[in-house]
Swiss-Prot record:
This is DNA ligase 4. Mg(2+) 1 binds at residue 389. Its EC number is 6.5.1.1. Residues 721-814, 867-965 form the BRCT domain. GO terms for molecular function: ATP binding; DNA binding; DNA ligase (ATP) activity; metal ion binding.
Length: 979
């Protein structure tokens, strides 16, 4: 099989298929027993899946009509969609209890296959199933049906558009032409589960093929279609697991959240009248739980410190460094049946087991971590559960390695356990939740940390306790944040040491703080991809930019909406390189569907503009089939082109978040909360700046009152170079000059005279007099009211003299008027003046100054924004504008830095500092320290020269985090100097 057919190693771990029956009886002695055989498999889709799907398709209808209640209560026809779904599920569960018994676990394993952690991954994907079906049905792979199965990602040669992008539906089309049976089969749910257990244990095609062949012989096409959806764990039945759990038992969702065990939900909660005992609401050894999460950053440190709930007796809170790794829980129990006497299991935040990667015992040959934990626990420790972060550690640099290298490092450690230089996994533990049979989640964090320090013996750079600092004020947080900036760390986490551990909850007891970088909105946003746009030029033929959405919360959802519905939010086309595009294609292949404007997928995606369908994508994808990407942006702006009425300005791709699915992507309400926090923070910063300015204001002596434009007795010094540029011209100068150079009225008159011109004190004293003014004085207003005289700004006089000086030796040339030279223009003059500059206001006749270039006209800004928007629609940014709006510093290679460069290096507008990839940690820390010592100032990105080169090659600005310099222990820095 190729990479498109079989799951990656991490998704197909070598773990047991399930517990033996005797072990199950011992573990669950009071589990319910069914009194009769399970229902036939076809009952699942005939009485559950199909009815739920029909509810999803039908319009909701008028509220008043649906709310009519007859004399015998409310009929199913009068229920709203959510109530009708519950009604269908309730009837199925009621029938199961009556005809089968109280053990609904066999059915739930097929209804919610993605929640079944007891059955291993099958290790096969769509292409492998297609190949086996071609063999089973003896179809020519080059035939129409063979092509449709093996190339299901492409539009079928004759398949219905309804099945395009739906592999199970494509299989139904093909199987329907050559079924082994047309009526439903006789396989029971229990029998299907047994066969699926065998299929999950099979690792080769010759083992999988006979199992799939038996399903083909005993099922009709519709049964096989649903079976394939179960194998792929892509059910799409029109109801979420929350609805099923809620109907089954009021404590079901809670128990699943703390155990991630579908089996426990079904067996321990089989009686809806018996609620969970208090002791059963906590965590259990060797059962995965959903961990506590840190709350999002708030608008001010003062508020965050207040949320730590300090008291007079105990005002302390803790500061921890935020690690850039994968959240991991470790379970350990004494077990004499395992070599070494200890059994281990590892789970990620999303309940994915990684025991196969890190080890199940001290002598596990595949254990990239556990082989080092022989002496990692204190005497007397029999069992524990630890919460921490698994990161990649680079022993050569003695520093964390970049995000995304963890699994590679773990696999490398498995293959070469004696390497002392290769990257390795390091578990940083920050909490203990269970010790020697006692649940510690109800104890305070301070007490849990004491227990952790007594129970664990750290193993250097393999298994360590994550340090913390005690603090009482926001100043200490700011100091820690400056240290984070200097060390290029992820951020901080503030923790309340008086708080219990809150399972499956994002609470203010833990709050994350991140440094704010130049040119960025603040928080990285994890957005779900819901649409794609084909590119042009080098990007042509593929989806090169993506429509991202915000998950709709219950509070924003319309009645009857899909649980996975999203609002359109922004288009992202910048920051992707070739590998990023390939990775997204790999995870979404075959799941894209062409957007049909006549039948838009409003159950999943809601665009702006209603029927106009603003920013309509070329292709769309269901949120549950899609990927989550991390996006950075310059700011948030209003836009009627996106459903929320807001969008991101200049969004840029950072990385793919494979640790998240659509359910954990950013929701509408979460984004609005983040936006509110950022805006409040900016307001407070502006207020602080204003207050500090007021403190520094100095009193100045009052100037004597003068009449503007009238100062005849002023002593005029030399006003500038002399020449003949104004020979034969008459001037009436009304005011002084304020820009680009300040000159008094007499100084301007002297400048005119020195260059061959004559000046007068009225506009009627000589013919064709040029009137000059920079402010609307009484005389200037009078001339303007007459409307028959052009009034020129003094800047034209200054520009003429300056250009004549630049062109010394050439014939004198009088500059034509430009729009910037006109204080007032008579009718018809505007077009003449406008023709003397380009679309950006750049003169055709004179040299543009650096001051004018730095003061970018609004037209250029708008053009840049249009070009940036075109990037997000699949076009390329012109190379010359790739680094527009950035201020990049290239430090000098010499140790002796000039005073001017030292001043430049601390300039507040610097966004990036480019250094040599081999620079030492000493030099890098010194660079970061320059900005970390400046409170309130945004931090520039420190990157290697590879960022410039790779961005240039990719024709887009790539994420800076990928190009951060490695941190070394010693040595002399080698700053990069171009050329």
């Amino acid at each position: 099989m190729d990479s498109d057919e079989i799951m990656p190693d991490e998704e197909h771990p070598n773990v047991p298929v399930g517990d033996e029956e005797s072990d199950i009886d011992e573990k669950y002695p009071n589990r319910p027993r069914n009194h009769s055989p399970t229902l036939p498999f076809h009952e699942l889709f005939q009485t559950l899946f199909n009815p739920l799907g029909e509810i999803k398709k039908k319009p909701a209808g008028a509220v008043a009509a649906r709310r009519k209640v007859g004399p015998h209560g409310q009929s199913a026809a009068n229920l709203n969609p959510l109530e009708r779904r519950r009604d269908v599920i309730e009837r199925f569960i009621s029938r199961w209890r009556k005809e089968v018994g109280d053990d609904i676990y066999p059915a739930f394993r097929l209804i919610l296959p993605d929640k079944d952690r007891d059955r291993a991954m099958y290790g096969i994907k769509e292409k492998a199933i297609g190949k086996m079906l071609v063999k089973i049905m003896k179809i020519d792979k080059n035939s129409e049906d063979g092509f449709n199965l093996l190339n299901w990602k492409l539009p079928g040669q004759a398949a219905t558009s309804r099945m395009t992008g739906d592999f199970a539906g494509r299989c139904f089309d093909v199987i329907s032409k050559r079924p082994m049976r047309t009526d439903v089969g006789d396989m029971l749910i229990e029998e299907v589960n047994e066969k699926l257990d065998k299929l999950s244990a099979a690792s080769k095609e010759e083992q999988q093929l006979p199992i799939l062949a038996e399903f083909y012989r005993r099922m009709n096409p519709e049964e096989l279609m649903w079976l394939i959806r179960i194998i792929l764990r892509q059910m799409k039945v029109g109801a979420t697991e929350r609805t099923f759990f809620d109907v089954w038992h009021p404590d079901a969702e809670n128990l699943y959240s703390i155990s991630s065990s579908l089996r426990r939900v079904c067996w321990e909660l089989h009686d809806p009248n018996i609620r969970l005992d208090a002791e059963d609401r906590g965590i259990s050894l060797m059962q995965c739980f959903q961990p506590q999460l840190a709350q999002f950053q708030m608008d001010s440190l003062d508020r965050m410190v207040a949320r730590m709930r300090p008291t007079e007796e105990d005002p302390v809170f803790w500061i921890e460094e935020k690690l850039d790794g994968e959240r991991m829980q470790l379970h350990m129990a004494s077990d004499d049946s395992v070599p070494g006497g200890r059994r281990f299991r590892f789970w990620s935040r999303k309940a994915k087991e990684y025991t196969y990667l890190y080890g199940n015992g001290i002598y596990d040959e595949n254990g990239s971590l556990t082989r080092y934990l022989k002496d990692a626990f204190a005497d007397g420790v029999q069992s524990l559960i630890l919460d921490g972060e698994m990161i990649t550690w680079d022993p050569e640099q003695d520093a964390p390695a970049p995000f995304g290298t963890l699994k590679t490092a773990a696999l490398s450690e498995q293959r070469n356990p004696f390497s002392t230089t290769g990257a390795r996994p390091l578990l940083r533990v920050f909490d203990i939740l269970y010790l020697n049979g006692r649940d510690l989640t109800g104890y305070t964090l301070r007490d849990r940390r004491k227990a952790l320090q007594k129970a664990v013996r750290p193993v250097h750079r393999r298994f360590e306790i994550h340090p913390y600092e005690e603090a009482t004020t926001k100043d200490q947080v700011e100091a820690a944040l400056r240290k984070v900036v200097a060390e290029a760390s992820e951020g901080l986490v503030l923790k309340n040491p008086r708080s219990p551990y809150r399972l499956n909850e994002r609470h203010d007891d833990w709050m994350k703080v991140k440094p704010e970088y130049m040119t960025e909105f603040g928080e990285s946003l994890d957005l779900i991809v819901i649409g794609g746009y084909y590119g042009s030029g080098r990007r042509g033929g593929n989806l090169s930019s993506f429509l991202c959405g915000l998950r709709v919360d219950d509070g924003h959802a319309s009645q009857g909406a899909s649980a996975s519905k999203c609002y359109s939010f922004c288009k992202v086309g910048g920051g992707f390189n070739a590998a990023d595009y390939a990775n997204i294609r790999h995870h979404t292949d075959g799941k894209w569907m062409e957007w049909n404007p006549k039948k838009p997928p409003t159950a999943y995606i809601e665009l702006a503009g209603r029927d106009a369908q603003y920013e309509r994508p070329d292709m769309w994808i269901k949120p549950e089939d899609s990927v989550v990407i991390c996006v950075k942006a310059a700011s948030v702006s209003a836009s009627d082109q996106f459903r929320l009425g807001l969008t991101l300005r200049f969004p840029r791709f950072k990385r793919l978040r494979m640790d998240k699915d659509w359910k954990s992507a950013l929701s509408v309400q979460e984004f609005l909360d983040l936006k509110s926090n950022v805006e409040q923070e900016h307001r407070e910063k502006e207020l602080n700046v204003d207050n500090s300015r007021r403190k520094r204001v100095k009193r100045t002596a009052k100037k004597p009152l003068t009449v503007a434009g009238y100062d005849m007795d002023e002593d005029v010094k030399y006003a500038g170079p002399s020449g003949h540029i104004f020979d034969g011209l008459n001037f009436y100068i009304l005011t002084d000059s304020s820009a680009p150079i300040k000159k008094t009225k007499p100084e301007l008159e002297q400048l005119v005279k020195a260059n061959g011109g004559m000046f007068f004190q009225t506009n009627n004293a000589a013919p064709h007099t040029i009137c000059v003014a920079d402010r609307r004085t009484v005389k200037a207003a009078s001339l303007q009211k007459r409307g028959d005289v052009d009034i020129i700004r003094p800047s034209w006089i200054i520009d003429c003299v300056k250009q004549n000086e630049i062109d010394a030796g050439l014939p004198d040339f009088l500059l034509p008027f430009e729009p910037r030279h006109m204080f007032f223009a008579t009718p018809g003059k505007h077009d003449e003046v406008a023709s003397n500059v380009d679309q950006f206001g750049d003169s055709y006749a004179r040299d543009t100054t650096s001051e004018e270039l730095s003061d970018c006209p609004e037209s250029i800004t708008k053009l840049i924004e249009r070009l940036q928007e075109s990037v997000n629609s699949g076009h390329e940014m012109p190379c010359g504008l790739l680094f527009k709006s950035l201020t990049i510093l290239f430090p000098h290679r010499n140790d002796d830095v000039s005073e001017s460069e030292a001043k430049t290096s601390s300039h507040p507008s610097i966004t990036h500092v480019v250094i040599d990839p081999e620079s030492s940690s000493k030099e890098i820390s010194s660079l970061r320290g320059k900005w970390s010592r400046k409170p309130g100032r945004k931090v520039p990105h420190i990157v290697t020269v590879d960022w410039v080169e790779e961005s240039w090659k990719s024709r887009t600005l790539l994420d800076e985090e990928r190009f951060q310099p490695k941190r070394c222990i010693s040595g002399i820095a080698k700053p990069y100097w171009p050329g």
